[in-house]
């Protein structure tokens, strides 16, 4: 019965991912916490779930020429070492057994859910500002130090994703949209997904090595979600985008506030 429930949960989140493009960490990790899984297990399992579900999308975007591998490399040069360093710290048993361990993870999750919801609220404004409304000196500064800024943002993403499993989607795309304002939306999304795969995989392996991944749970979630993502993407043209976005924002804000203050 529990296995069936996990398959249905995977299908629900997978359908949401296909429908909206958001939901891997933002919905799956809170759902696993509601099922009663400890925060490290929920985050670790979701990270490997995200790596597997995003891999197909990365391949698809690469085939269409929608991945800038130079940007992926710059982001990964910052994010992956940070993830490994954080896991080296977490692997200290005395810290894992302290009351602050789970509290740090749930607080990080709550903050990132609020950040993701805020980005969704202002997504159109961010896109408009990135192309039309930024001061010339700001554009010049960003362009001149773009590689350094991208590397620095990789450091930030590595920390956020490792601590919360959230951030590789909407947050990462918003960062890229700001830095690379002349790049097409399709290439921004493809590049963001391509970077998310190695980051979530490495971060997930760190949790797995500490015993914080439930492989049976992971398998059942994938059984439900992989076909559901395809169905959700097909249904996305039939459902008003505004309605979906508003429901998602309310849900993410509510969960974010809850996990930030419990």
Give the ranges of each region predicted by the language model.
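Juxtamembrane transmembrane-helix boundary motif
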Residues: 1-9, 35, 63-163, 178, ...
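Juxtamembrane transmembrane-helix termini in multi-pass membrane transport proteins
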Residues: 14, 20-72
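Residue positions within transmembrane alpha-helices of multi-pass solute transporters
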Residues: 23-24, 55, 81, 85, ...
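Interfacial segments of multi-pass membrane proteins
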Residues: 28-41, 171-187
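Transmembrane alpha-helix boundary and packing residues in multipass membrane permease domains
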Residues: 30, 46, 87-88, 170, ...
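Transmembrane helix-bundle signature of multi-pass membrane transporters/permeases
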Residues: 43-51, 76, 80, 189-197, ...
């Amino acid at each position: 019965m529990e296995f069936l429930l996990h398959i249905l949960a995977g299908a629900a989140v997978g359908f949401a991912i296909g429908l909206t493009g958001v939901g891997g960490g933002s919905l799956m990790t809170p759902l696993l916490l509601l099922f009663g899984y400890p925060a490290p297990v929920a985050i670790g399992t979701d990270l490997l779930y995200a790596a597997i579900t995003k891999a197909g999308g990365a391949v698809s975007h690469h085939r269409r020429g929608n991945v800038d591998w130079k940007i992926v490399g710059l982001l990964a040069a910052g994010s992956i070492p940070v993830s490994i360093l954080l896991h080296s710290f977490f692997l200290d048993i005395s810290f894992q057994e302290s009351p602050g361990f789970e509290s740090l993870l749930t607080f990080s999750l709550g903050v990132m859910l609020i950040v993701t919801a805020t980005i969704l609220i202002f997504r159109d404004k961010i896109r408009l500002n990135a192309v039309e409304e930024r001061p010339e000196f700001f554009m010049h500064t960003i362009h001149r130090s773009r590689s350094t800024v991208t590397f620095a943002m990789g450091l930030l993403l590595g920390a956020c994703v490792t601590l919360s499993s959230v951030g590789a989607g909407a947050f990462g795309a918003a960062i890229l949209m700001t830095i690379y304002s002349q790049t097409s939306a399709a290439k921004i999304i493809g590049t963001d997904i391509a970077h998310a795969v190695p980051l979530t995989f490495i971060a997930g392996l760190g949790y797995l090595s500490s015993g914080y991944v439930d492989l049976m749970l992971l398998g059942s979630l994938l059984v439900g979600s992989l076909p559901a993502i395809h169905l959700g993407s097909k249904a996305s043209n039939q459902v008003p985008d505004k309605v979906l976005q508003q429901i998602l924002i309310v849900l993410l804000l509510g969960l974010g506030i809850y996990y930030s203050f419990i």
